[in-house]
């Protein structure tokens, strides 16, 4: 797909995606680049994976750089935004994708696990949004990452993760009000099961007696959750993010959009 034939043109825009070295984040970064945006690929640990995403974006004709930062640390989030603006001269789109998954019965969740999950999924996203507001150009876009388990789809032993994402739905409603003075829209996407390496690592938790099935069998079973009878893939999420990032998506504001093919 060329920029001229793309549904949404992001040429001249600068986008930053946290946690974009792999999975959904990588797909978002690449799709933003495909639509013409210059992209900052953020990663916490694997520089090699992030550089592969950068190379793919550059092969599409868009500029891209990788910047390391652990967004659990607010000081690193500030540095990430500062470096992005210093390199590209401005910032128009911030997508907060970095997150962790967690499973555990209420009676077994430790304080350490609670802090691990909320420090990134909730606190981390809050301060990514704060710094995005401070750094974005007027008319920018903030897109956070929720989950269909936050509001539509209940999974046993998943309260910690679901709660950490449920806060995001509340954040975006209020952030949209706070960011109106800069004409910045704030939304979240709430994916359902999406086939990534993380999906394969935890899919047995979502399917009753899931440990009895192979990863391929679990993926086939998960496809039946949607009336469209297929799995969700990272590109499905990326396309919705790109719509929200575009000028066509301006009138969607303060919302969390479930992207799960009707599974929940």
Curated annotation (Swiss-Prot):
Role description: Atrochrysone carboxylic acid synthase; part of the gene cluster that mediates the biosynthesis of the tetrahydroxanthone dimer secalonic acid D. The pathway begins with the synthesis of atrochrysone thioester by the polyketide synthase AacuL. The atrochrysone carboxyl ACP thioesterase AacuM then breaks the thioester bond and releases the atrochrysone carboxylic acid from AacuL. Atrochrysone carboxylic acid is decarboxylated by the decarboxylase AacuI, and oxidized by the anthrone oxygenase AacuG to yield emodin.
SUPFAM superfamilies the UniProt entry points to: NAD(P)-binding Rossmann-fold domains (SSF51735)
Listed pathway(s): Secondary metabolite biosynthesis
Reactions catalysed according to its record: 3,8,9,10-tetrahydroxy-6-methyl-1,4-dihydroanthracen-1-one + NADPH + H(+) = (3R)-3,8,9,10-tetrahydroxy-6-methyl-1,2,3,4-tetrahydroanthracen-1-one + NADP(+)
EC number: 1.3.1.-
Uses, biotech or industry: Secalonic acids show unprecedented anticancer activities against various human cancer cells and might be interesting for further derivatization, targeting diseases such as cancer.
Pfam families: adh_short_C2
Gene Ontology biological process terms from the UniProt entry: secondary metabolite biosynthetic process
Organism annotation: Aspergillus aculeatus (strain ATCC 16872 / CBS 172.66 / WB 5094)
Span of the signal peptide: none
Protein name: Short chain dehydrogenase/reductase AacuN
Top-level enzyme category: oxidoreductase
GO terms for MF: oxidoreductase activity
Family that this chain belongs to: Belongs to the short-chain dehydrogenases/reductases (SDR) family.
Keywords: NADP, Oxidoreductase
Catalytic site: 146-147, 161, 165
Chain sites annotated for binding NADP(+): 24, 70, 97, 130, 161, 165, 196
């Amino acid at each position: 797909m060329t920029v001229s034939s793309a549904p949404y043109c992001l040429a001249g825009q600068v986008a930053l995606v946290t946690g974009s070295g792999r999975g959904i984040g990588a797909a978002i970064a690449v799709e933003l680049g495909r639509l013409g945006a210059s992209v900052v690929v953020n990663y916490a640990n694997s520089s090699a994976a992030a550089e592969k995403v950068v190379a793919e974006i550059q092969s599409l004709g868009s500029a891209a750089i990788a910047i390391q930062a652990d967004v659990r640390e607010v000081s690193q989030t500030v540095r990430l935004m500062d470096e992005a603006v210093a390199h590209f001269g401005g910032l128009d789109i911030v997508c907060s994708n970095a997150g962790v998954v967690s499973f555990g019965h209420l009676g077994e969740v430790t304080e350490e696990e609670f802090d691990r999950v909320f420090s990134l999924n909730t606190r981390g996203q809050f301060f990514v949004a704060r710094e995005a507001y401070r750094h974005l150009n007027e008319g920018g876009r903030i897109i956070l990452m929720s989950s269909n388990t936050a509001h539509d789809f209940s999974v046993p032993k998943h309260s910690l993760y679901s709660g950490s994402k449920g806060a995001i739905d509340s954040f975006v409603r209020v952030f949209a009000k706070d960011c109106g003075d800069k004409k910045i829209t704030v939304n979240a996407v709430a994916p359902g099961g999406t086939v990534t390496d993380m999906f394969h690592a935890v899919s047995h938790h979502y399917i009753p007696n899931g440990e009895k099935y192979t990863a391929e069998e679990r993926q086939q079973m998960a496809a039946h959750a949607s009336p469209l009878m297929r799995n969700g893939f990272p590109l499905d999420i990326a396309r919705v993010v790109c719509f929200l990032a575009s000028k066509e998506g301006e009138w969607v504001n303060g919302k969390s959009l479930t992207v799960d093919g009707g599974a929940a």
